């Protein structure tokens, strides 16, 4: 602490302070006006922590100077771009968005409101963008490095728990660990990721236990609490279906029995529970390490759910990301039936649209979906639409629209962004060759500026 004070005191001789691994999170030296990078780190988390040491406002400090003595390759520059891009409100930072941010000097982050400006020369921009295009950021070496840096930051001898990722602002994206492939095998869970990177001192779970862990992990981030509350009841020793229902009902405002029935159906289908003669039983032998792992997973999922939906008035959060199976789960449909782009339920119509069409798709699947303005989205129905579907569209009271730019990137399926509700107008028949209908969906909420730039809609 004395060294920190001397560094900021103009009457002291101390001008520069060197340190290894102790000037990251939790250090506050607002008078620092220069940050030097002398050791390589490929962790965007560590980079942001170290950069943050110089970004505090202070008397007679108009700006901070960053000297990066190891930035001698564009690979390093890409890591810096990733670190800055992670400050975006967009939870999915795919290449298209990252390249857009680089081209525009990260203006969409709104850092200028805090007196922060970023300038990259044109030649460097093109080199960085070329590197972004050629690099696979979902490769195991990237994610393993993020994991190891986080573990070192926590100074924990064992693997970090699920809740460790919830409790640190500098944690990597845990859900990303659950979605990647290591070799030809998908991780499916945090446990699967840890096994894939050969983490030491892992508990050994049976195939039945792993199947339960994988299904519960597949529900993250939660769009409803029911499944996790059922499992929590089982871990607490409750097995009676009627008492479990009563307990869950107490915890969920506006509880509906059909929601719990739907959750139980797919918990059983996902091999997480067994239901017979009014009793519910957890799949997998009840062992201490297994139950401890599940409890940690439940705490993570439910804490994250409470943080996201504490003040929610609607089923879906505006401008947030959802997988198609999550939407189907929320509206009590089969989450496995996710190969369609349109669903109808209780007078509502659910539309899933992609803006960039995969070149490998058949022509009749390359729908002409696009933004006409920030509050009007053009949507094309399925080809050779049936009279029944056309009638359902005409009868729809409102349309809930989910949009994504690309379907997948580097082997990872990307979610949709929920852009809100709207209504169908201006149906146009006969303007396509495949017998579809073009509509304008007039949205109740126009796209915010950041999403306009993300979706690259131009007036």
Which role fits each region the language model picked out?
Residues 203, 207-216, 312-415:
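Acidic, glycine-rich low-complexity segments with interspersed aromatic residues
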Residues 17-32, 52-54:
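SF2 helicase motor core recognition
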Residues 79-227:
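Long, largely alpha-helical accessory region at the distal end of helicase-like NTP-driven motors
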Residues 234-237, 243-356:
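Charge-dense, extended regions
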Residues 30-34, 42, 59-65, 396-399:
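Short glycine-/polar-rich loops that comprise or flank the Walker A/P-loop
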């Amino acid at each position: 602490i004395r060294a920190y004070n001397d560094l900021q005191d103009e009457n002291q001789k101390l001008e520069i302070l060197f340190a290894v691994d102790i000037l990251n999170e939790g250090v506050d030296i607002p008078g620092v006006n220069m940050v030097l990078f002398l050791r390589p780190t490929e962790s965007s988390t560590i980079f942001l922590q170290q950069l943050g040491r110089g970004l505090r406002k202070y008397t007679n400090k108009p700006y901070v100077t960053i000297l990066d003595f190891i930035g001698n390759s564009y690979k390093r520059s890409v890591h810096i771009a990733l670190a800055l891009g992670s400050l975006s409100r967009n939870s999915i930072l795919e290449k298209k968005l990252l390249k857009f941010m680089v081209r525009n000097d990260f203006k969409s982050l709104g850092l200028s409101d805090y007196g922060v400006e970023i300038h990259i020369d044109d030649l460097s921009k093109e080199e960085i963008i070329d590197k972004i295009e050629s690099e696979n950021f979902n490769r195991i070496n990237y994610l393993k490095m993020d994991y190891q840096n986080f573990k070192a930051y926590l100074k924990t001898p064992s693997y970090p728990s699920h809740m460790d990722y919830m409790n640190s602002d500098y944690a990597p994206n845990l859900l990303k660990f659950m979605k990647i492939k290591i070799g030809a095998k998908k991780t499916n869970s945090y446990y699967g990721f840890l096994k894939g990177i050969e983490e030491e001192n892992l508990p050994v779970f049976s195939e039945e236990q792993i199947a339960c862990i994988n299904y519960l992990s597949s529900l993250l981030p939660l769009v409803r609490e029911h499944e996790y509350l059922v499992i929590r009841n089982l871990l607490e020793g409750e097995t009676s279906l009627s008492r479990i229902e009563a307990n869950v009902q107490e915890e969920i405002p506006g509880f509906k029995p059909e929601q719990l029935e739907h959750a139980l159906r797919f918990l059983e289908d996902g091999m997480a529970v067994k239901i017979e003669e009014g009793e519910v039983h957890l799949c997998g032998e009840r062992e201490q390490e297994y139950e401890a792992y599940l409890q940690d997973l439940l705490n993570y999922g439910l804490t994250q759910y409470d943080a996201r939906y504490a003040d929610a008035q609607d089923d879906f959060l505006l401008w947030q990301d959802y997988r198609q199976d999550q939407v189907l789960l929320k509206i009590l449909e089969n989450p496995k039936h996710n190969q369609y782009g349109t669903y109808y339920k209780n007078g509502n119509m659910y539309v899933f649209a992609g803006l960039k069409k995969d070149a490998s798709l058949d022509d009749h699947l390359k729908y002409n979906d696009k933004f006409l303005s920030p509050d009007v989205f053009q949507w094309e129905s399925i080809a050779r639409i049936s009279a029944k579907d056309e009638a359902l569209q005409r009868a729809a009271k409102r349309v809930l629209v989910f949009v994504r730019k690309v379907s997948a990137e580097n082997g990872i399926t990307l979610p949709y962004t929920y852009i809100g509700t709207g209504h169908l107008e201006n149906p146009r028949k006969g303007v396509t060759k495949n017998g579809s209908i073009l509509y304008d969906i007039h949205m109740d909420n126009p796209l915010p500026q950041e999403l306009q730039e993300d979706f690259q809609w131009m007036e």
